[in-house]
Amino acid sequence: MHLSPQEKDKLLIFSAALLAERRLNRGLKLNYPESIAFLSFQVLEGARDGKSVSQLMSEGTTWLSKSQVMEGIPEMVHEVQIEAVFPDGTKLVTIHNPIN
């Protein structure tokens, strides 16, 4: 199987996000890489589901709360940017202050 660098990145995000989701379900708090992967995956899947950039930017601030991440993580994550494929092309989605 031959994958482009972008496809490899998406698979890595998926793997890390799956791990993060499982840890959340077990009641564990996410660390920095898990938090970023979880948020990034939500954007990628939302784009795949047909949501708009503005919709994802708005929803992105509700996906994780301070109680779901380790201490200090909300202060480290000021924004998350990820390129996602939408029906009308690839767009950059930026979520400001995603962990409330």
Swiss-Prot record:
One GO MF term: nickel cation binding
Disulfide bond annotation, renumbered to this chain: none
Keyword Hydrolase found: yes
InterPro entries hit by this protein: Urease_gamma, Urease_gamma/gamma-beta_su, Urease_gamma_sf, Urease_subunit
Subunit-level organization: Heterotrimer of UreA (gamma), UreB (beta) and UreC (alpha) subunits. Three heterotrimers associate to form the active enzyme.
Record key words, sorted: Cytoplasm, Hydrolase
Stretches that traverse the bilayer: none
GO biological process: urea catabolic process
Pathway terms, separated by semicolons: Nitrogen metabolism; urea degradation; CO(2) and NH(3) from urea (urease route): step 1/1
Lineage: superkingdom: Bacteria
CDD domains from the UniProt entry: Urease_gamma
Record has Hydrolase as a keyword: yes
Gene name for this UniProt entry: ureA
GO cellular component: cytoplasm
Cell location: Cytoplasm
Name under which the protein is recorded: Urease subunit gamma
Organism: Prochlorococcus marinus (strain MIT 9312)
Catalysis: reaction(s): urea + 2 H2O + H(+) = hydrogencarbonate + 2 NH4(+)
Major site of localization recorded for this protein: cytoplasm
The protein's Enzyme Commission number: 3.5.1.5
Family named by the database record: Belongs to the urease gamma subunit family.
